[in-house]
């Protein structure tokens, strides 16, 4: 039986209890690395293309560890580089597929992004799976759960608006909360 989104969010808050400092610090390092590259014209975007996927897998490893009450460590955000070829391949394929679907209209692009949303969690757990297989598995896992995932994301819009009022500082706390909630979602659909 699938849990309600509010239950997943409550579980995420429980996982973050006592771990907020680690979570905020880890996301701050992630944001500094990825964000700094995005502000460097041209070359930053190119370099960012090659590190965003592995860093995202690392964030998934970190959030899954926190979600499971395991030993989460800041260094986990760099563990996506251990399986670099597969992770980069999956990231580039996701970018291309989502872009192609978005060319049709915005809605198909959003649906494609949601369908592939579990790819990095799959790669975080299984470093033997190939890029295309991870994308296919994500698409299969999300079959019947896309709306639930979309609604989970919508629950954070109010919080995001409040974070804007803090000149973005609130996102240091909101980002881990959102990502742990998505990790809980992954665990829930994996068990379903």
Annotate each language-model stretch with its function.
Residues 1-192:
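Hydrophobic alpha-helical membrane segments
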């Amino acid at each position: 039986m699938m849990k309600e989104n509010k239950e997943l969010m409550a579980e995420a808050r429980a996982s973050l209890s006592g771990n907020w400092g680690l979570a905020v610090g880890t996301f701050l390092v992630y944001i500094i690395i990825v964000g700094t590259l995005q502000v460097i014209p041209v070359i930053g975007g190119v370099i960012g293309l090659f590190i965003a996927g592995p860093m995202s897998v690392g964030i998934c490893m970190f959030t899954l560890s926190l979600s499971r009450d395991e030993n989460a460590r800041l260094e986990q955000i760099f563990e996506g580089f251990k399986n670099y070829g597969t992770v980069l391949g999956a990231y580039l394929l996701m970018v291309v597929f989502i872009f192609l679907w978005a060319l049709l209209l915005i809605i198909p692009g959003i649906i494609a992004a949601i369908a592939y949303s579990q790819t990095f969690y799959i790669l975080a757990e299984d470093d033997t799976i190939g890029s295309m297989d991870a994308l296919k598995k994500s698409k299969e896992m999300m079959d019947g759960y896309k709306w639930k995932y979309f609604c989970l994301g919508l629950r954070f819009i109010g919080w995001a608006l409040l974070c804007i009022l803090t000149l973005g500082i609130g996102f240091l706390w909101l980002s881990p909360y959102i990502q742990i909630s998505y990790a809980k979602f992954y665990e829930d659909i994996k068990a379903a």
